[in-house]
Amino acid sequence: MAAKIRKGDKVVVLTGRDKGRTGEVFEVRPDAGTALVRGINMVKRHQKQTQAQEGGIISKEAPIQLSNIAYVGKDGKPTRVGFKILADGKKVRIAKSSGAEIDG
């Protein structure tokens, strides 16, 4: 299955504790159907001290389901993502609301 959400996309959270907040995707895990979004779904982890890093409680992003986030189009509104095959045979993502190409 082709990836509708990719690294670097600006997305908005649709459900949950962070509903309505936007952020940038910095990692997608297609096998798990999740993504990591910068500053969204933050959790606290207890870090054991090592020679390389200090111990303590750190905040980090937890994965969020792809179904719970939506791509934010150029108009700033969330939209669904579809695919279109151009005349030269290239497959590009399009915003369903406006029909505009996302990447090309």
From Swiss-Prot:
Name of the protein in its database record? Large ribosomal subunit protein uL24
Query: According to its UniProt record, which protein family does this protein belong to?
Result: Belongs to the universal ribosomal protein uL24 family.
Instruction: Offer one example of a GO biological process linked to this entry.
Output: translation
Binding partners and assembly: Part of the 50S ribosomal subunit.
Keywords for this protein? Ribonucleoprotein, Ribosomal protein, RNA-binding, rRNA-binding
Task: List the molecular function annotations (GO) for this entry.
Answer: rRNA binding; structural constituent of ribosome
This protein's encoding gene: rplX
- Membrane-crossing segments per the record: none
Q: What does this protein do?
A: One of two assembly initiator proteins, it binds directly to the 5'-end of the 23S rRNA, where it nucleates assembly of the 50S subunit.
Q: Name one GO cellular component term.
A: cytosolic large ribosomal subunit
What InterPro entries would the database entry show? KOW, Rib_uL2_dom2, Ribosomal_uL24, Ribosomal_uL24_CS, Ribosomal_uL24_KOW, Translation_prot_SH3-like_sf
